[in-house]
A protein has these predicted regions:
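Hydrolases whose catalytic domains are alpha/beta-hydrolase-1, hotdog thioesterase
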Residues: 222-227
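Conserved acidic catalytic loop of the alpha/beta-hydrolase fold
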Residues: 195-209
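A domain-start/cap signature at the N-terminus of enzymes
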Residues: 29-141, 173, 294
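Active-site machinery of serine-nucleophile hydrolases
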Residues: 139-199
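Alpha/beta-hydrolase fold nucleophile elbow
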Residues: 206-218
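Active-site nucleophile loop of the alpha/beta-hydrolase fold
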Residues: 180, 237-245, 268-272
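C-terminal catalytic histidine-bearing segment of alpha/beta-hydrolase fold enzymes
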Residues: 270-338
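Sec-dependent N-terminal signal peptides
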Residues: 1-26, 30
């Protein structure tokens, strides 16, 4: 499959100017008191050189999203790559967990930042679950964070300080971090969201009935695009992840049977060209050229947008490691604040 190379952020500046068919935060109607976005302010370059970013061919179900590429024998230095794997490939040997699909799953419990933390061992890899200290199940929702390439659930949980970021969001939710593909050769671990939810309940952890928000970084799009038709998913947040699968996300936000009830936030650095192009399709899209320092800096139109596109000033990995993006965006969801 032919390699798709993401264009660096500096070249993509022109891609941030949305065409007339896409609403921007400063477009009429007249701005409300929170509207302070100035389109005359140039978008700053990403923090340092672009981190590696996934390339992707089209999805298995939507091959037209990308022309069929041929993968390189090794990653190009300084670039992330994510593409769709259409054929089975050999994998490194990994320890196997015996699992009949029904019995109780083993978990380890500890306390992290004052909240209960569980690491569940499944046949599809580790699943981390964290409850904030003041969690109230009666009004709680669920946040599922899917990591990108070159890490796993354990690595992302530890190195990206996810518990710290989840706590900083002040949202009343159970936070779930499952294993996901760590490279092009890995299969999607949880192609069906219902199986992931079942694994959590098999560890004797009760899921709340509130809103479900899915966050995916980079190559996580391969997993998230397979969950768009799940009846419980209310909102998806793509963090520099729109490399492919546009048809799936179109179904989620526009053409699917439950699209009227959904919201999508797209944050882009390495994927700015693809993400801006996707947003231009929709008259209801609202664009913003920087991540705000807090949710309060978002205008009412931005907060209420069915599709919010943000051109990030943070580069690919800083989007998920800086602590400036995930907590802020979780406050622009249907979750209840603590």
């Amino acid at each position: 499959m032919k390699l798709f190379v993401a264009v660096v952020a500096g070249v993509l500046g022109a891609g941030l100017v949305m065409e007339p068919g896409v609403a921007r935060a400063e477009d009429p109607p007249a701005p409300v008191p929170w509207d302070d976005f100035d389109d005359a302010i140039p978008v700053p370059p990403a923090d340092g050189p672009a981190d590696p970013a996934p390339d992707a061919a089209g999805s298995p179900t939507e091959p037209g999203d990308r022309p069929p590429p041929a993968p390189p024998s090794a990653p190009v230095p300084g670039r992330h790559k994510a593409r769709m794997s259409l054929t089975n490939r050999p994998h490194m040997a990994r320890s196997v967990v015996e699992d009949d699909g029904e019995g109780r799953l083993e978990k380890r419990e500890d306390t992290v930042l004052g909240g209960k933390h569980f690491r569940i061992k499944t046949a599809r890899g580790a699943v981390h679950v964290w409850f904030p200290p003041d969690y109230a199940r009666e009004t709680a929702g669920t946040v599922i964070y899917v990591h990108g390439y070159y890490t796993d659930a354990d690595g992302a949980w530890r190195e990206h300080e996810l518990a710290k970021q989840f706590k900083a969001s002040h949202q009343n939710a159970i936070f779930i971090v499952p294993d996901a593909p760590s490279g092009n050769e890995d299969d999607v671990k949880w192609p069906a969201l219902k199986d992931l939810r079942k694994a959590v309940t098999r560890a004797n952890i009760h899921l709340p009935d509130g809103p479900v928000v899915v966050i995916g970084h980079s190559g996580a799009f391969r997993t998230v695009m397979q969950w768009v038709d799940h009846r419980l998913v209310d909102q998806i947040i793509l963090l520099d992840a729109l490399y492919a699968g546009e048809s799936a996300f179109d179904a989620f936000i526009a053409s699917g049977k439950r699209a009227d009830d959904h919201k999508l936030i797209v944050v882009a650095a390495s994927t700015a060209e693809e993400s801006a192009s996707f947003a231009r399709r929709y008259k209801f899209a609202v664009a913003r050229e920087r991540m705000p320092s807090s949710a309060g800096e978002l205008s009412r139109r931005e907060r209420g947008a069915k599709l919010l596109y943000i051109r990030s000033q943070f580069e690919h990995m800083a989007i998920v490691t800086s602590g400036r993006v995930i907590p802020t965006l979780l406050r622009v969801t249907p979750l209840k604040a603590l």
